Amino acid sequence: MMCSGYYNYDTPYTPEFAGQQDFQGQVVHPQHWPEELDYQDKQVVVIGSGATAMTLVPSMAEKAGHVTMLQRSPTYVASRPDQDAVANTLRKFLPGSVAYAITRFKNTQMQKFLYGKMRAEPEKMKKVLVGMVRKALGPKYDVEKHFTPKYNPWDQRMCLIPNGDLFKSITAGDTTVVTDHIDHFTT
């Protein structure tokens, strides 16, 4: 087993950006989210495209005026249902612990299979993953720029989004993805 960590929960890494001291908006680190944060009808920028951003962006877009997800480079993103139909069916007929064990086995085997497939046939699986995003966002969306990484699937961690909510937020016009570097903050 190998485990690694790269941050301290109490003092998360927060990069500094030119112009940040003059920025008049509020800067929030999601690790220490203020409960009273009011972003209703505001223009929000989420910096990053990791797992936190992938769930934060569509959720915030429900209340914000608009949310922009700013990323330096794309991440592989796959949508999957937030409910497991097999697990839900098994729980109707089996004790919870048995249903859990079967579901856990099914999910770990599926993950092993998909991981192996992506490592064995990276170009083919890259086309599948990018094709799913293209199908969700439509032919006019620049999937190459915003959702096609330069690396192979699982060279870096992939992000799963529940029920395609990020894609729905983008197609609804509530969210924009920008792939670029931050030069400086403006007021």
Where are these regions (language model features)?
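Generic low-polarity alpha-helical segments
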Residues: M1-M2, F185
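Rossmann-like dinucleotide-binding core of oxidoreductases
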Residues: M2, Y6-D142, T175
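A conserved short coil-to-beta-strand element within the FAD-binding core of flavoproteins
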Residues: W33-E36, H146-Y151, M158, T175-T187
